[in-house]
Amino acid sequence: MSKLQDIRELAQEHATSVSSSPRDWMGYMDTAARLYRYPFTDQLLIHAQHPQATACASLELWNEKMFRWVNRGARGIALLDENGHNTRLRYVFDISDTHMVAGGRSPYLWQMQEHQQEEILTHLAEAYGLEEKDTGTLSDALMAVAREMVADSLEEYLDGLEYAAEGTYLEDLDEVTVRSDFRQLATDSVYYMLCRRCGLEPMELLEEEDFMHITDYNRLSVLTFLGNAASQISESVLIDIGRTVHKISLEEARKEVEISNERNYNNFNTLLRENKGVENNKEENIENEGGTDYGTDLSPQGGLPVSEPDR
């Protein structure tokens, strides 16, 4: 029970830590963007214990699905498992703490290439009904998507926040201010994580001061509301983008195979023509060289020349 209590306290303490300044919050989001498939509390605890993590999974998944063994002495990342009646701990390991064995493989981690950005931009514009003014660049589109998604679910994510605000800095703020600040913080946080995972620089549109109100969420009880909003919305959009990137990459690979096959076919035909030309030239050369009409190696009967006995 003591270890479970330690992790609960770690979550509380780290929530205060990452909300203590805009830079600390951005540091947390750098980790969360890489691990967007995890819920907020898991992201928070992973950042507290292994901030450089890139791909985390259970020991069983690494061993049985990926055929990767966890390194001797590696420390598991403790997470809170609250799915059952009683909260318990579960452990995950980052890929950096594993190594491949025979038949092992690495997880697929999609990466958006620069030449794919235009197609992703087109997809986002169609999927989210973006206006033309929001499709100048991929960064513009991601900001518009973040703004739209937060606005659509704002009431859901704010529900209950006023009751959790007791004893926090939010307690002294009026409802309109809390609502406005939450909406802006959530939008900017979603945008930040989308950009980070897509390989873009979020600070081209943002400034550090845009996250100044994060310090009002100085306890886990209220930070969870903001964290859940940013995490869940980011996950939804990034899953969509990831699938689109994968689809584009598969199509590019298919075209490359077709081009390669066509190139090989053309090379094969060229080689056949060249070989035929060489054979024709060879026949002409043999027929025009000295000796008999049958060349120098064959007798008139078509066999090898009969050797004369040694004298």
Enumerate the predicted regions with their spans.
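N-terminal accessory/interface modules of nucleic-acid-binding and processing proteins
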Residues: 1-276, 283-284, 289, 294-311
